[in-house]
Amino acid sequence: MRATAIVLLLALTLATMFSIECAKQTKQMVDCSHYKKLPPGQQRFCHHMYDPICGSDGKTYKNDCFFCSKVKKTDGTLKFVHFGKC
């Protein structure tokens, strides 16, 4: 009984550690692949939920929509630095 409890506790601990690592990995980059480059003069309408992203140009973007729009506009020269303010 005691050995079963220890094995179960160990399995639960490992599962928790792996799920935390997976959650960290999913939010280490911004995926701009689903944003298309717009024709000249056309604007993208982005939601205004604040989830800041720091770009390689030293600017803080409100969220992934604003950041990815700029990435597409610059043909990929703008790079992701980190989540949060610059």
Curated annotation (Swiss-Prot):
Kazal-like domain: from which residue to which, for each copy? 26-86
Family matches, as InterPro entries: Kazal-type_SerProtInhib, Kazal_dom, Kazal_dom_sf, Prot_inh_Kazal-m
Q: Which stretch is the leader sequence? A: 1-19
Keyword Signal: yes or no? yes
Pfam families registered for this protein in UniProt: Kazal_1
* Covalent S-S links between cysteines: 32-68, 46-65, 54-86
Keyword Ion transport included in the entry's annotation: no
Question: Site described as Reactive bond, positions?
Answer: 48-49
Q: Name one GO molecular function term.
A: serine-type endopeptidase inhibitor activity
- Assigned keywords, A-Z: Disulfide bond, Protease inhibitor, Secreted, Serine protease inhibitor, Signal
Q: In which tissues is it expressed?
A: Skin. Highly expressed at sites of hyperkeratosis. Also detected in thymus, tonsils, testis, pancreas, liver, placenta and brain. Expressed at stratum granulosum and stratum corneum at palmar and plantar sites (at protein level).
This protein's GO cellular component annotations are:
extracellular region
Q: Where in the cell is it found?
A: Secreted
Q: Which domain of life is it from?
A: Eukaryota
Assembly, per entry: Dimer. Interacts with KLK5 and KLK8.
What function does this protein fulfil?
A: Serine protease inhibitor which specifically inhibits KLK5. May contribute to the regulation of the desquamation process in skin by inhibiting KLK5.
* Descriptive protein name: Serine protease inhibitor Kazal-type 9
Q: Which organism is it from?
A: Homo sapiens
